[in-house]
């Protein structure tokens, strides 16, 4: 391989697992670049690499929905402690607003939050609701949520991370910046030259610059998030409100499954519902730390309705009952995957 191209690929992280695809594509668009290429050719090649690698970045802008965010919060299955914490925060902000209106002193409150919890426990959903509540309270003008992670903030070579993080922050102004698995910005061992540190420094600076226009919510596993917060005094001073998202119980996962059924017009017999509860209880009792919680329930539902479709594929003139009812056999296919569930 051309040595200069090889250096460039290493710099942007393309010579890793799956990097061969990048090399092949670069071969199509840049094989004419030789050992003595000029700076313009190298810049063009680097731009091409950037345009390819940035497609892998994780970033989603979620505009606020219409409706009552407080009712949406109350309608969530489980998460009673989370609801109490969010309501408590909203009550405090409301009271401070009233005190300010009467000319009284107000207590400073940090709107930034740490969400502890396993995957699929509702952290992203609640972050979106919090953004809308903050808009309702006058804390934020828009209340939208920009959702990202390490890949969406960190560059692949020196000098890219700062501008990239700034770009994400700019999209989040007047709303919430939600960073999932934020602990990945500080690898275990705390490599000082890691690009995650640059992203953190940039975010902390922008939190100060835009203190009235930006709310940051960081989320991830409890122990890892505590390590993340403890890694930087700036994080410790800005994040002082923590909300714990517990794993769902078997009964709650059953309710989540039934919620999907109701939304999509499916039914269960009493016998099949009893089987459903038994299987979710088993999954909860044998889960590992990567268990998907609500995502698991959704996946079981999607696989179950696919199994129903396969079962009825050759039948004609189906009545409403057959079109809507899920059987135990359908659910067995839905629960077939044992990923993140111990024997």
Go through each PLM region and give its residues.
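C-terminal helical "lid" of AAA+/P-loop NTPase domains
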Residues: 292-314
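Walker A/P-loop
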Residues: 106-143, 170
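Canonical AAA+ ATPase core
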Residues: 184-190, 198-245, 263-264
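Alpha-helical transmembrane anchor segments and their immediate juxtamembrane flanks
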Residues: 2-41
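Short glycine-rich substrate-engagement loop in P-loop NTPases that contacts/grips substrate
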Residues: 142-172
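Conserved C-terminal "switch" segment of AAA+ ATPases
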Residues: 137-142, 224-230, 236, 245-290, ...
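C-terminal engagement/docking regions of AAA+ P-loop ATPases
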Residues: 307-343
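Pre-Walker A (pre-P-loop) alpha-helix and adjacent loop at the N terminus of AAA/AAA+ ATPase modules
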Residues: 69-111
